[in-house]
Amino acid sequence: MVSQMFGYIVVNQSEMKFKEYDVYRSYYCGLCQSLKERYGVLGQLSLNYDMTFILMLLTGLYEPEDPFEKHQIRRNLFTDYVADMTVLFACYKAEDDWEDEHSLKGLAYSYLLGKKCRKKPLLYADKVRSISLAMQDFVDAEKQGDADIDTMAQIVSCREDEWKDNLERLGFFLGKFIYLMDAYEDVEQDIKKGTYNPLKKRYEEPGFEEECRQILTMMMSECCKEFEQLPILQNVDILRNILYSGVWCRYEIVREKREKDSVNEVTGNDL
């Protein structure tokens, strides 16, 4: 259950200005273009909004020039880096799909995308190595049935500078939020399938929904605390829209659906 980058870190479009959304989409399109150039159509399949946030975060912090900037597409020196990290995570996700569910689609995607990765120069050898070790440790913990929801961390920082610690802590809590949101959304399905989910043991307990909300809120609170320590001005309103509002959009959809299903089940039993 390697649950990284599933589209939980999104904007709340209803609370954005049209111009802000156009800027957001331009970074998304720039990342899409980079993925296609570097990895082809297979790479484009890994495109997601979570990594678009990372791209905008790094851009806002370091304010690089945009040599490829157009009205609808924005690219800078971080775009290719984020594209490479996107593909790396996609490979792990595909491998995990094969391990968990024997998904032939996951196996094929991992193999084909992995071939493209191996053909490219290894520009981030140390980072790839550290991520690989972290992900393997996590997979090993899952195989042992370790339901400790504090085992997930992710690396967001890309430079050895004064902001490295803040970025790593931000990425740590953001990664845990994504992981727990995925677990929260999939818990019923994972119980039926018998696949690993760190929330399985708690699902039938009283107060499950409230406990999940509290934990998720705590993760995002810590994430936002680290974010606010960064000297970001560029597109800061878009980034705050994501961190303070957008991340809860999917949660509310899942919670409301589960609540509705529960009511329907009770009503059906009463008939």
Per-region residue spans from a language model:
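Short, electropositive alpha-helical surface patch
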Residues: 238-244
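Acidic catalytic motifs of isoprenoid enzymes
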Residues: 1-169, 176, 180-209, 213-217, ...
